[in-house]
Amino acid sequence: DPTVIALAEKAEHHFVGKRGGRPSIKQPAINQLLVDLAGAGKRVLRLKGGDPFLFGRGGDEALALTRAGVPFRVLPGVTAASGAAAAAVIPTTMRGVNKAIILVTGHAAASDDDVDWAALAASGQPMVIYMGLRNLSLIAAALTAGGLDPATPTAAAMSATLPDQKVVVSTLGAIAGAVARAGLHAPSLIFIGDIVDLRAQLLPALAP
């Protein structure tokens, strides 16, 4: 946000943001930059979107600082799943609907052994997928193969909380095509489960 950056106009700025599919600084280089700047006697602020310890690589950076003997503090943020859910009017939990919510990264291919999509499908709990837009068709296929009904309500929220926010609601089996037709791009989150149906019930009473 340029307005936030402007508050520190006299500071030295290092842009290390990441976007899927675009060239970016590797995480080890970011870790070392933090250590080097702190070692040079500078007060360093690592500004992140969302919560640094939830798919934000904050743990990697904190560990690098710890190993280098650099003291630090962590300020909590609002993770994208919470912010996007509220902005898209999709309650992540609802009495009588679910008692848990799964947060998972879709950055790797759906066939990656690091994520057991069949187990997630069998859990019966709704989920929010971070960084999964590029692999959405693979993820949907893996969840369906794991037993999740292709008719399961599914939504994609792009640029949630921002002026260009766009929300697409479909089903698990059709969401990849719906997202492509709508022209959604990163950053986007995917919501899967009956919680998505609550959006249609709540929207009519939403204040402008």
Cite the ranges covered by each PLM segment.
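Glycine-centered flexibility sites
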Residues: 17, 49-50, 56, 77, ...
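A contiguous loop/helix-start segment that scaffolds small-molecule binding in enzyme catalytic cores
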Residues: 29, 39-45, 57, 98-100, ...
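Short hydrophobic/aromatic-enriched beta-strand-loop microsegments
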Residues: 12-18, 69-73, 92-102, 147-156
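Short, acidic/turn-prone active-site loops that include or flank metal/cofactor-
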Residues: 1, 16-24, 78-80, 99-100, ...
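Class I S-adenosyl-L-methionine
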Residues: 1-75, 83, 175-177, 188
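Structured adenosyl-cofactor binding patch, chiefly the S-adenosyl-L-methionine
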Residues: 80-93
